[in-house]
Amino acid sequence: MKNTLYLFMCLITTLCLAQSKEYNSAVVKINKYVEGTLVTPYSDDSVPLIIFIMDAGAINRDGNDRMSKNDTFKHLAYELAKSGIATYRYDKRLFKMDGLGIREHEISLDHFIEDAISVIEFFKKNKKYKKISIAGHGQGSLIGMIAAKGRANSFISIAGNAMPLDQVIIEQIAKQAPGLDKSAAVAFEQLKKSGRATEYDPALESIFRYDLQPFMRSWLQYNPSEEIVELEIPILIMYGDKDLQVETAQAEKLKEVVPQADFLFVQNMNHILKEIKGGRLDNHKSYNEPFRKIMPEIISGITNFVKQ
């Protein structure tokens, strides 16, 4: 009886271990600027790979900044692995700039594009994956569009803007602080023409901070609606109606310029792909609640798109 019980317990333990090992996770360093985590499902066959590019700011590979912890892309990577999809997610260069001795005024959006391209080229040389898809979140959507051109097999825009940065910010200011939008418009024109904005309301200092202006100017060179139409690969556009950072109008505008793209609009989903049943307070709280699950529509939507 004891032997039978022992064998039974061994079998249960083996099954549990097998279930927990649905994927392998490893740190992969591309170069001194780019380091991330590769999550690969256990499979005898070649699997597709998704490269995630994070949103604006000092965001790490899991989707967190220094003020919040939601682990969105960590959870998403594990869920996609269960569906037979490998993922690579990496820290934004801003997240590790102090350790690299990089100053804020030295950072350009082009650096982020270079980082994304270096990741794509690294995995293309590997020749291990069935196909490579790029998925950009927020600002990462624009970066991904540019990097994917001529390099990736498909592109996924997650809560990305359709309009150039200055238009997005001016519209937001007009709604939140009417009157200041005119000052912002003048400052953006100065920044684009002369490289420096000097005439703006002091209330806009956080936007037009001196050391931030070179980065802003580099970002202003790109228009998402112009970049995405140059892609000759399958496109998936994803948004949620509880997004406090990117308005639903951006989704419609992006859809207009690439009508052939697949489009997924998720009810009650916020910017970090979590379900929000309450109001703004519940939405803000979710940014520090890593236990919240990713919306299932996102997992199935990405899986179906990548595997088609």
Predicted feature locations:
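N-terminal cap/lid segment of alpha/beta-hydrolase-fold proteins
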Residues: 19-45
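Short, surface-exposed "cap/lid" segments of acyl-processing enzymes
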Residues: 43-80
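Alpha/beta-hydrolase active-site loop
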Residues: 104-126
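Accessory cap/linker subdomain of secreted extracellular hydrolases
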Residues: 154-226
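Short beta-strand/loop motif that positions the catalytic acidic residue
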Residues: 231, 237-239
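Catalytic active-site module of serine/aspartate enzymes centered on a nucleophile-bearing elbow/loop
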Residues: 272-273, 278-308
